[in-house]
Amino acid sequence: MYKYFLFGLMVFSITVSAQVVEKNLYAKSFIDQKAPDFHVTKWLTNEPKREGKFLLIDFWATWCGPCRKAIPELNKFSKEFNDDLIVIGISNEKEETVKRMQVPKIEYYSAIDSTEKMEKILEIKGIPHVILIDPDGYVRWQGFPLYPGFELTSDVIKEIIEKYKKK
């Protein structure tokens, strides 16, 4: 009987340790696929020149705590990768609502999309949701920027830029 118990425990242990932790996107995966056409209804900052740049697009809202928590990281990425990367925050809220938010301060490009065109194509079901698009228009990273174990970090961005930057 003891042998059967040990055998069962061993099989259970192997099964549990073999399980892979998966990243839940809360959206349709576009990894390594063409990104949907870029669309906003109104820029709240000047419109960036996107040609030849990587785009980090953050779908967010002022009422979303995790969205606001990610803003300082996105500010950091915008400064750190200024030569290669454009960070854009897109909210579906009213212009006045977004402009009224003072803390944390957004130090990257900002726009609203009241039509939610890109959100619908990406089938986003949870925010914040970030996509990182290479200069050829392919999604190279997608997800929640602070998701434990799958965080979007400077190292991740650097690796993607080095791999997909046009020479």
Region locations from a protein language model:
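Thiol/disulfide oxidoreductase modules built on the thioredoxin-like
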Residues: 100-106, 113-160
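Bacterial Sec-dependent N-terminal signal peptides
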Residues: 1-22
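A short beta-strand-turn-helix
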Residues: 30-55
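Short pre-active-site segment immediately N-terminal to redox-active cysteine/selenocysteine motifs
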Residues: 53-55, 59-63, 94, 126
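Hydrophobic beta-strand anchors of alpha/beta hydrolase catalytic cores
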Residues: 56-57, 87, 130
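Structural microenvironment flanking redox-active thiols in thiol-disulfide oxidoreductases
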Residues: 68-106, 115-120
